[in-house]
């Protein structure tokens, strides 16, 4: 199918308020969407049925740009940010984990949405200690539009609003801790996955009516224009429908929740390559968009400036 030409986004207007818009991929222009003004996509997705009815068939190609629009993370903020771990066979192989079992099942961890999620061009802040070994993980993000518990894989598509791009930034150094009081505490998921700015997301959400199935879309990631990851999004061990079902078997999914679907081969750890101050990371998924973020060393001044600014990025 032809790649969709736009996605739903959140922008900050000249009045300083968040608003729902549409991002045209061809020229990067933000345009207004018809209907009531929402305070961003997170507010609109709570009324997904009405939004879908209003925008299905709508085309923003010839609309004027919103003046002085600043693009933010599309969802500010998901109630839950659920991340699938080890969901590509190629990534398992490069990490020395062997081949997946035939009955491989999904497993998940969580990131705190309000402090990890940043938007396009916002800075990924990393600790200056090189032993942190901060890595990249380009991923497909599944955005929930209709909530539920115990959703079947067959019904999952009807609960999905659309798809976005996620970068699951990961600190490899502190992930495994020595001297843990029990095997259950050997891995420090807070230090590894949940640090501030460790979940760039965006630039927009492609509605599912424009991209019914992302499986054939190409997922790529570059660091400083060097291609690191390149794989078909649908090469997941557990498909996106099954991920929705597996997550909803444990928790109630709510509109605006995001499930990050795991990363393919090409991360830095097996090659001893990690992010450094001044790097620029780009993640692109065909039909969804390109997410770009610079990398900066975390300093007290930089963190203070980010926290003092209007929330999000």
Predicted regions and their residues:
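Catalytic-pocket segment enriched in acidic/His residues
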Residues: 2-4, 15, 91, 125, ...
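Short clusters of small/polar residues that mark proteolytic maturation junctions
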Residues: 34-35, 165, 232, 292
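Surface-exposed beta-strand edges and flanking loops
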Residues: 32-35, 126-128, 297
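Gly/serine-rich nucleotide phosphate-binding loop at the start of the catalytic core
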Residues: 2-47
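Active-site microenvironments in enzyme catalytic cores
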Residues: 2-11, 43-227
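Well-ordered beta-strand positions
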Residues: 12, 22-24, 135, 143, ...
């Amino acid at each position: 199918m032809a790649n969709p030409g736009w996605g739903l986004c959140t922008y900050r207007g000249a009045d300083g308020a968040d608003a729902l818009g549409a991002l045209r991929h061809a020229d990067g222009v933000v345009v207004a969407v018809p209907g009531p003004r929402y305070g961003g996509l997170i507010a609109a997705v709570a009324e997904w049925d009405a939004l879908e009815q209003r925008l299905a068939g709508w085309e923003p190609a010839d609309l004027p740009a919103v003046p002085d629009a600043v693009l933010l993370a599309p969802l500010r903020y998901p109630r839950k940010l659920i991340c699938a771990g080890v969901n590509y066979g190629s990534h398992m192989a490069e990490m020395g984990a062997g081949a997946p079992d035939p009955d491989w099942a999904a497993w998940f961890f969580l990131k705190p949405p309000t402090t990890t999620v940043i938007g396009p061009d916002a800075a990924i802040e990393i600790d200056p200690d090189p032993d942190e070994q901060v890595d990249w993980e380009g991923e497909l993000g599944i955005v929930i539009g209709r909530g539920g518990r115990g959703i079947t894989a067959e019904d999952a598509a009807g609960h999905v609003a659309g798809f976005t791009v996620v970068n699951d930034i990961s600190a490899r150094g502190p992930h495994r801790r020595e001297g843990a009081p029990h095997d259950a505490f050997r891995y420090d998921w807070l230090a590894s996955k949940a640090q501030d700015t460790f979940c760039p997301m965006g630039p927009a959400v492609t509605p599912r009516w424009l991209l019914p199935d992302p499986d054939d879309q190409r997922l790529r990631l570059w660091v400083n224009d060097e291609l690191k990851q390149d794989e078909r999004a649908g090469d997941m061990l557990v498909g996106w429908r099954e991920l929705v079902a597996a997550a909803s078997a444990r928790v109630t999914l709510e509109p605006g929740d995001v499930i990050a679907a795991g990363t393919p081969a090409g991360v830095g750890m097996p090659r001893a390559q990690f992010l450094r101050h001044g790097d620029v990371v780009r993640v692109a998924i065909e039909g969804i968009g390109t997410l770009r973020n610079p990398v900066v060393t975390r300093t007290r001044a930089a963190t203070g400036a980010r926290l003092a600014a209007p929330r999000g990025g």
